[in-house]
């Protein structure tokens, strides 16, 4: 009897390598391979500064990321080879305060 070998189809695991910007606080660059910035535009790299390795992360089997949408990261990595995570916009505490004061006064007028 002849033995038949069935080749295993291995799906390519999706990993990303995350770098912290040396020039911009809370700004991170996700790429597919360690130290491979070949698909990142030169202007972006110039503004990003010297990339500082933050972590390597498997994306498969993960449901979410801390400060980025997982599906957007995966899509950007496969389509353009990188994903840029910018810091969240600063809170406008004055606007929040005025909004809450306005709400409180409208309730007091009733």
UniProtKB/Swiss-Prot annotation:
Gene3D superfamilies, per the entry: YcgL domain
PROSITE patterns the record matches: YCGL
Pfam families given in the database record: YcgL
Compositionally biased residues, Polar residues: 97-110
Domain YcgL as annotated: residue spans: 14-98
InterPro entries tied to this protein: YcgL-like_sf, YcgL_dom
Region called Disordered, residue ranges: 88-110
UniProt-recorded name of the protein: Protein YcgL
Gene behind this protein: ycgL
């Amino acid at each position: 009897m002849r033995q038949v070998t069935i080749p295993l189809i291995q799906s390519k695991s999706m990993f990303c390598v995350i770098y912290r910007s040396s020039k911009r606080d809370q700004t991170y660059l996700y790429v597919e391979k360690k130290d491979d910035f070949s698909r990142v535009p030169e202007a972006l790299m110039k503004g990003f500064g010297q990339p500082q390795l933050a972590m390597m992360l498997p994306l498969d089997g993960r449901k979410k990321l801390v400060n980025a949408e997982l599906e957007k990261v995966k899509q950007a990595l496969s389509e353009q080879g990188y994903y840029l995570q910018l810091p969240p916009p600063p809170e406008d505490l004055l606007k929040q305060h005025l909004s809450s004061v306005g709400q409180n006064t409208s309730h007091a007028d009733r």
